[in-house]
Amino acid sequence: MVSNWNWNGMKRRRTPRRGYGRPYKPVVPITRVVVHQSALLKKDEVVGCEIKPDGDVARYKMMKVMLTCTLRMPPGELVNYIIVKSSSPIANWSAAFTTPALLVKESCQDMISIIAKGKVESNGVAGTDCTKSFNKFIRLGAGISQTQHLYVVMYTSVALKLVLEHRVYIEL
């Protein structure tokens, strides 16, 4: 990790208190892009949406993603979700993922890798809908370029309304 740092001040005299110079890491400017989506999810169906910056950004590298989701559902129901990275676009969600557990099927294991996962369970009084939400902050390591794809995939046990917002931290 230290190999890509710059060592300035090597020409200075070395002192016991301070070495040849202080290293510094070059910081690339990061832009934040917020995207807002809403959808109606059907019962027992695997659905997903792509997480990417909106607008006319041609070349980018996603470094971090902050995912915020708000759900309105009856009590006693469950929503499973996973965040996956894929080398090619996913067209058929049910062909790529198993139904309740959202595991990657064997035919797609070479192109899809799971980054994060979670679940949301609702509780409350029967007969009334309750609103649940979750926040997930995902660090993407070396980053995801514009040629790769990042998806959030969900499975619900009941039909519900979903509001999904994500803030993408990108390097241009």
Swiss-Prot record:
Pfam families membership: Nanovirus_coat
Name of protein: Capsid protein
Keywords carried by this UniProt record: Capsid protein, T=1 icosahedral capsid protein, Virion
Annotated gene: DNA-S
Subcellular location: Virion
Primary localization: virion
GO cellular component term, pick one: T=1 icosahedral viral capsid
Origin: domain of life: Viruses
Lineage summary: Viruses, Monodnaviria, Shotokuvirae, Cressdnaviricota, Arfiviricetes
Family: Belongs to the nanoviridae capsid protein family.
Species: Milk vetch dwarf virus (isolate N)
Keyword Transport annotated: no
